[in-house]
Amino acid sequence: MTAKPDPLIHPITRLSICGLLAAGADWVEFAALRDAAGISDSVLSKQSRVLEDAGYVEVRKGAVGRRPRTWFRLTADGRRAVQGHLAWLAQLEEAVAAAPEPMTGGGDHPGGVPGKSSPGVTRRH
């Protein structure tokens, strides 16, 4: 597994879909995935098609009684992509946590607010 961002699943909607599929049962029904992701039918249809075209998601269509149903599951490639993307996000989180605190205050110096002067300092124009 390589820790690198995956531009295909980086958009939050696709990342949510993949994350829910990775954490869910083998097959997840359309309505359950839509509700868990908090998105509309059309958004799930469009974004799942992108993921399916990339080989990250498998789609199965069928019926329960007379009602048509659609189920999704993450493929092995999709699972690897999610794991790599999450590893990259974890590395990014570690880097941010290890970064020094930014300087605060006014003035025209590094860490100051651009265009703001420190109290008691007159700026000439």
Model regions and ranges:
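Short, hydrophobic-biased segments on the C-terminal half of alpha helices
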Residues: S48-R49
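Short beta-strand "wing" residues that participate in macromolecule-binding interfaces
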Residues: V59
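Basic, amphipathic "hinge/linker" alpha-helix immediately C-terminal to the N-terminal HTH DNA-binding motif
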Residues: V64-L86
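Juxtamembrane helix-loop transition sites at the ends of transmembrane segments
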Residues: A31, S40-V43, L74-R79, E94-A97
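Amphipathic alpha-helical dimerization/coiled-coil segments
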Residues: T2-A3, G19, R80-H125
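Glycine-centered, phosphate/nucleic-acid-interacting loop/turn motifs that mediate DNA/RNA or nucleotide
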Residues: G55
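N-terminal helix-turn-helix DNA-binding core of bacterial DNA-binding proteins
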Residues: T2-V43, V64, W71
